[in-house]
Amino acid sequence: MNKIIKSIEDAQLKSEVSKFHVGDTVKVYAKVKEGNRERTQVFEGVVLKRQNGGARETFTVRKQSNGVGVEKTWPVHSPIVEKVEVVRLGKVRRAKLTYLRDRVGKKAKVKELVR
């Protein structure tokens, strides 16, 4: 049974996925359908977490918009996500940055990784 599920999931995976990690600041280009029009919307923020793997893999991005924290979660292999562009590399020591939800201002910043 697992082989059948694995073969179906492999067929649904994107061939080219951007490499990004937790703590990176990214721009997510997502397709938005409004009525009969389709446009690309850019959402820029810090990657809080990546979950699961394979076809079910998701990632969550958080940003501050007018003083309000906004989080969005997308499947990595979704056709809605056109591309994920890395703006800054972040240096973190945790797999999930949920503690950033409670922080405001400079405390909510992630150190930049210099490579």
Swiss-Prot record:
GO terms for cellular component: cytosolic large ribosomal subunit. One of its GO terms (biological process) is translation. Keywords: Ribonucleoprotein, Ribosomal protein. It comes from the Bacteria. Pfam families: Ribosomal_L19. PROSITE patterns: RIBOSOMAL_L19. GO terms for molecular function: structural constituent of ribosome. This protein is located at the 30S-50S ribosomal subunit interface and may play a role in the structure and function of the aminoacyl-tRNA binding site. Belongs to the bacterial ribosomal protein bL19 family. This is Large ribosomal subunit protein bL19. It comes from Lachnoclostridium phytofermentans (strain ATCC 700394 / DSM 18823 / ISDg) (Clostridium phytofermentans). The gene is rplS.
